[in-house]
């Protein structure tokens, strides 16, 4: 949580201890941590940029995300971006850390395709 959240040196700056434990238990109790990591393993094994997305896409770049795509990279691999936005806060768990900001990003993106 420390490396992947938007915190000031302490994960509890981004999420409460209860929130972190709740999330960890969702993976620990049913034993699904390994299967949830499969997406990452498969994506990196085949190369993140090996497939072009020709469909309209929205890209939100959070400052503490583990991979932050540049506009140039997005234009190369996603030739139909309808939204590209660099945000001031949020990390890999942006929907969890900044739910209102994340919801606004989704709304603003889909407002362009109505």
What are these regions (language model features)?
Residues 1-114:
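C-terminal subdomain of alpha/beta-hydrolase-fold enzymes, centered on the catalytic histidine
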